[in-house]
Curated annotation (Swiss-Prot):
Protein name in the entry: Protein matrimony
Originating species: Drosophila melanogaster (Fruit fly)
Effect listed in the UniProt record for changing R95A: No effect on degradation during the oocyte-to-embryo transition
Free-text description of this protein's post-translational modifications in UniProt: Probably ubiquitinated: degraded during the oocyte-to-embryo transition by the anaphase promoting complex/cyclosome (APC/C) containing cort protein.
Residue window of motif POLO box domain (PBD)-binding: 39-41
Gene3D superfamilies: Transcription Factor, Ets-1
Deletion phenotype: Mutants exhibit a strong dominant effect on achiasmate segregation, inducing both X and fourth chromosome non-disjunction in females. Precocious nuclear envelope breakdown in oocytes, due to defects in meiotic arrest in G2.
Function: Polo kinase inhibitor required to maintain G2 arrest in the meiotic cell cycle in females. Holds heterochromatically paired homologs together from the end of pachytene until metaphase I. Haploinsufficient locus for homologous achiasmate segregation and may be required for the maintenance of heterochromatic pairings.
Keywords: Cell cycle, Chromosome, DNA-binding, Meiosis, Nucleus, Phosphoprotein, Ubl conjugation
Length: 217
């Protein structure tokens, strides 16, 4: 203990420490305000990380990021000939007077098809008369069959097929003739004697028997 003592030589010890505000040299960085656009202002000595170009908002009258002066982009007025000016005014008036076309509802498909059928059928007077006669005869025939079928609506609605009606009325011997002719319930209710001859029932006895049964339905 007697031999130990405090050293008398003074030594300077340097330690790492946080730099003060005065030593922050990176805060004095300048940015070209004409090429950088940013809206973050500067408050005191604190600068935003993105190096905002807005500086001294209170002292400067205009913002450095304000748009460029319009005077540099003003178009030089050119002299217009009176005739050319009148023509431009006429074109402008003509465009303003244009109105959209009136909206027309499309016609139904049936109204379009019917005139086409009439034109095709009446291309010549002979064919027109023949077609009209055929159409009237078909219309009359379909109307006659529908009227007769309506009178037998109960049978038509409650029977499964033609065979069932013939078996029920005792006409099972004629089932084959009706099936080969592909006669359905509506046609069965509106059959006439001439129709029976067409399906192969030529004898008067068969025709009379079938017609009597159909009339009693």
């Amino acid at each position: 203990m007697e031999n130990s003592r405090t050293p008398t030589n003074k030594t300077k010890i340097t330690l790492n420490r946080t730099p003060t505000l005065k030593e922050r040299r990176w805060n004095t960085l300048k940015v070209n305000t004409s090429n950088v656009r940013c809206s973050t202002p500067i408050f005191g000595n604190f600068r935003s990380p993105n190096l905002s170009p807005i500086e001294n908002m209170g002292t400067k009258g205009k913002s450095p990021v304000s748009p460029m002066r319009f005077a540099t982009f003003k178009k030089v007025p050119t002299k217009v000939h009176p005739k050319q000016q009148q023509q431009q005014q006429h074109q402008h008036c003509h465009r303003t007077q244009l109105k959209p076309p009136p909206f027309v509802l499309p016609k139904p498909q049936e109204e379009i098809i019917e005139p086409e059928r009439e034109i095709k059928s009446c291309s010549s007077p002979d064919t027109c008369s023949d077609d009209s006669n055929m159409e009237t005869s078909l219309a009359l025939e379909s109307r006659r069959r529908s009227i007769k079928a309506s009178n037998h609506s109960y049978v038509v609605n409650h029977a499964a097929n033609v065979e069932q009606i013939l078996m029920h009325m005792g006409l099972e011997n004629y089932v084959t003739n009706f099936e080969e002719a592909h006669i359905d319930l509506v046609e069965l209710a509106s059959l006439e004697r001439a129709d029976l001859v067409k399906i192969g029932l030529n004898t008067d006895e068969d025709c009379n028997r079938i017609m009597d049964v159909l009339h009693t339905l």
